[in-house]
Amino acid sequence: MELTTRTLPAQKKIALVAHDHCKSMLMKWVERHKALLANHTLYATGTTGNLVQRATGLNVNAMLSGPMGGDQQVGAMIAEGKIDVLIFFWDPLNAVPHDPDVKALLRLATVWNIPVATNLSTADFIIQSPTFSDTLDVLIPDYPRYLAERLK
């Protein structure tokens, strides 16, 4: 597949997602980085977003809850270039009924080459990166070219 460049803006659009057993960990992480996150636009699946907003006072654009379609809403935003970073604390020790949605969300984040953190260490690496609040060019699929090839 041919690639093109997308520039992630200095003010990132960050999606926050956490499975039930990981929500408190995400809350503590957001609280720890609240001052920096306040400079960015936050999105989240429903329950997570409402909990983060209530706990921190940060403005969070909440989608539906993950099992009700929120993971897919976030995935669609990634595919549309409307999410720049995904912080997704998922629970590897407990199965969730919407596991196919989880896999699809992670697949889309990989396809569209956005930074993804699935644990505390990676989330800290991303947010503490010197480039976190700068613009950043990333390679993404050249969808118009992909579509043109498929329609030949």
UniProtKB/Swiss-Prot annotation:
Which UniProt keywords are given for this protein, alphabetically ordered?
Answer: Lyase
Write down the InterPro entries for this protein, in alphabetical order.
Answer: Methylgl_synth, Methylglyoxal_synth_AS, MGS-like_dom, MGS-like_dom_sf
Gene Ontology cellular component list: cytosol
What reaction(s) does this enzyme catalyze? dihydroxyacetone phosphate = methylglyoxal + phosphate
* NCBIfam families reported for this sequence: MGSA, PRK05234.1
Q: Which GO terms describe its molecular function?
A: methylglyoxal synthase activity
Any single Pfam family the record assigns to this protein: MGS
Where are the coiled-coil regions?
none
- State the protein's name: Methylglyoxal synthase
Transmembrane segments annotated in the record for this chain: none
| Major enzyme class | lyase
Q: What does the record give as the function of this protein? A: Catalyzes the formation of methylglyoxal from dihydroxyacetone phosphate.
Q: Which residues form the signal peptide?
A: none
Residue intervals of the MGS-like domain: 6-152
Residue numbers binding substrate: H19, K23, T45, G46, T47, T48, S65, G66, H98
The similarity comment for this entry is: Belongs to the methylglyoxal synthase family.
Q: Where is the active site?
A: D71
The Gene Ontology biological process annotation of the record reads: methylglyoxal biosynthetic process
Q: Could you tell me which SUPFAM superfamilies the record lists for this protein?
A: Methylglyoxal synthase-like
EC annotation from Swiss-Prot or TrEMBL: 4.2.3.3
